[in-house]
């Protein structure tokens, strides 16, 4: 079926294209056409099943009411939870959401940013890689509304939301130490990310304060690409070189979950280790009920991402060029066993 156009409606009613456009955009109050004619036009448009091109209309008005969301991984439970909250909050403000995945790849992330800009989304929410700093700087220079979360660039004038990474990590590791754990390994990934570096610093601080400087054999760096296989190799090495390991600190819930699978496959009891992790997944309740957790405030992170971005978008629309930065550091909820 051929799509009905403004021209078709104008022909059916016997008026100009401009009159139809005015009626469909509610401009009869401006005196361009009478209210009676506007009602007649809108009734005919409904009868003809007219569907407006909202994107084209948005472009004419300088807005699309679309927000771009770039995640490192759509399959990651944390990011999917964040996406759900952002979508709910965005809809409350009249926005649609366009979700993309970068897979933590610099080149892909840059392509996605450029694609979203070409679609003229009103703003972008992103959990960026550190390597994409140059592309983020371009957004800032263009005064493009953008908010980062989970990861950030401390030297850029940028709206961002993160958790208290170092403090939460410090408290988790200190709790393991207070429970008598003396050889605590750390499993981490992507050290180029500021958040991972901060979590490592929290671990290191707790160990050094307790007089237990970190031993190289207890440091497990898992490459993100093919992380399942890489994690197995890292655990093989730790258990071989540090057989007296009695605790694990995981900088992400994914590393913790994969470690639990490794223990299950190798018939290793989780009860012999003290374990702590940033964020949680429901599986922990079954596979590791004694896991100490710093739960990230998913709801608050998602809601504030939308709130800050919306304020930024509205400031731009009203040409309020006063540059303001909102850097939020949110506390985690500690669940210590």
Model-derived segments and their meaning:
Residues 1-63:
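N-terminal helix-turn-helix DNA-binding module of bacterial transcription factors
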Residues 17-22, 59-74, 175, 183-190:
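Short beta-strand segments enriched in small/hydrophobic residues
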Residues 72-80, 100-108, 161-171, 187-234, ...:
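Hinge/beta->alpha junction and helix N-cap segments in small-molecule ligand-binding domains
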Residues 88-133:
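Central regulatory/effector-binding core of bacterial HTH transcription factors
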């Amino acid at each position: 079926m051929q799509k009905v156009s403004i021209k078709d409606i104008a022909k059916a009613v016997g008026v100009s294209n401009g009159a139809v456009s005015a009626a469909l955009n509610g401009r009869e109050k401006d005196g361009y056409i009478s209210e009676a004619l506007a009602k007649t036009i809108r009734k005919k448009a409904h009868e003809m099943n007219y569907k407006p091109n909202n994107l084209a209309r948005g472009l004419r008005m300088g807005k699309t009411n679309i927000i771009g969301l770039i995640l490192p991984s759509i399959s990651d439970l944390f990011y999917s939870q964040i996406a759900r909250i952002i979508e709910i909050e965005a809809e409350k403000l009249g926005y649609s959401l366009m979700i993309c995945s970068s897979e933590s790849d610099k080149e892909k992330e840059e392509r996605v940013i450029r694609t979203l800009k070409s679609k003229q989304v009103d703003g972008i929410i992103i959990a960026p890689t550190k390597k994409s700093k140059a592309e983020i700087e371009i957004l800032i220079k263009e005064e493009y509304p953008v908010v980062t979360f989970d990861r950030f660039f401390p030297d850029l004038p940028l709206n961002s939301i993160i958790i208290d990474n170092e403090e939460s990590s410090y408290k988790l590791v200190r709790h393991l130490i207070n429970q008598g754990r003396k050889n605590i390994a750390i499993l981490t990934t992507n050290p180029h990310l500021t958040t991972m570096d901060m979590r490592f610093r929290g671990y290191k601080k707790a160990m050094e304060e307790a007089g237990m400087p970190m031993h190289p054999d207890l440091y497990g760096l898992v490459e993100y690409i093919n992380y399942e296989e890489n994690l197995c190799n890292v655990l093989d090495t730790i258990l071989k070189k540090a057989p007296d390991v009695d605790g694990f600190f995981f900088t992400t819930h994914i590393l913790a979950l994969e470690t639990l699978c490794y223990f299950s496959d190798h018939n290793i009891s989780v009860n012999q280790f003290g374990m702590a992790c940033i964020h949680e997944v429901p599986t922990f309740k079954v596979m590791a009920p004694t896991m100490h957790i710093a739960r990230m405030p998913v709801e608050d992170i998602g809601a504030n991402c939308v709130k800050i971005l919306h304020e930024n978008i509205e400031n731009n629309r009203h040409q309020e060029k006063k540059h303001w930065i909102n850097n939020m550091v949110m506390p985690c909820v500690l669940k210590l066993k």
